[in-house]
């Protein structure tokens, strides 16, 4: 049910990201397409009003690597869907994007902290001048907080935001995969090393945040 929610049911960070989207939009790892559908509705409303504001939505391209997700999105009414990997060189050949969305822990697709620069360089290559990446994540340090308020984190071990993830629905289990949560200071530092500016847009109620890379 969480994957099929409407704009009204989304957490405030996702609503904020959708409100900030503008121009030609790329929705990465769209899942069931809830964000693309919300943006489609907004774009249709803007067109009906004849609005020509600079922050209007002009187009929405939706991508996911799962054929089943793409089929579900098609059935739900998402219009421009492509079953393609973000790193496929065919993506973005024609033109860049003004807004790239990576929501529901957008850093996750990097898998490991060592892969984050590769992800950021790829996103940068897909941006138009003055374009933006809107990405959310969480700082998992709260998991390691002890009763004294200190954090028991092994600084010599792997980065604490690297986790093993597995999708389960009733008795059906997917294959485990690497998933990454990143604290904002580290995300900002890595983004800047890739030639991107990192900006904290908003914080959620439980160590989660929305950032803009530009």
Task: Identify the residue ranges that each predicted region occupies.
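Conserved SAM-binding loop of SAM-dependent methyltransferases across substrates and taxa
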Residues: 32-44, 54
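SAM-dependent methyltransferase
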Residues: 129-186
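Conserved SAM-binding strand-loop segment of SAM-dependent methyltransferases
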Residues: 77-88
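A short glycine-rich, Lys/Arg-flanked "PGG" loop and its adjoining helix->strand segment in the class I
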Residues: 117-129
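S-adenosyl-L-methionine
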Residues: 1-20
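A short SAM/SAH-binding and catalytic strip from SAM-dependent methyltransferases
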Residues: 97-117
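Conserved class I S-adenosyl-L-methionine
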Residues: 23-31
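Conserved SAM/SAH-binding beta-strand->alpha-helix loop
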Residues: 66-67
């Amino acid at each position: 049910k969480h994957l099929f929610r409407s704009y009204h049911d989304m957490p405030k960070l996702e609503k904020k990201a959708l409100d900030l989207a503008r121009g030609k939009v790329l929705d990465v790892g769209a899942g069931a397409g809830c964000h693309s559908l919300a943006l489609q509705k907004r774009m249709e409303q803007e067109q009906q009003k004849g609005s020509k504001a600079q922050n209007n939505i002009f187009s929405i391209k939706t991508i996911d690597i799962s054929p089943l997700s793409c089929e579900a999105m098609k059935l739900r009414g998402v219009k421009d869907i492509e079953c393609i990997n973000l790193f496929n060189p065919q993506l973005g050949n024609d033109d860049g994007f003004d807004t790239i969305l990576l929501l529901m822990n957008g850093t996750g697709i990097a898998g490991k902290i060592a892969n984050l620069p590769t992800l950021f360089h790829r996103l940068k290559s897909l941006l138009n001048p003055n374009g933006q990446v809107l990405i959310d994540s969480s700082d998992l340090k709260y998991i390691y907080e002890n009763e004294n308020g200190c954090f028991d984190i092994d600084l010599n071990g792997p980065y604490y935001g690297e986790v093993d993830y597995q999708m389960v629905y009733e008795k059906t289990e997917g294959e485990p995969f690497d998933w990454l949560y990143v604290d904002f200071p580290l995300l900002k530092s890595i983004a800047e090393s890739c030639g991107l500016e990192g900006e904290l847009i908003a914080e959620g109620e439980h160590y989660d945040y929305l950032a803009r890379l530009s």
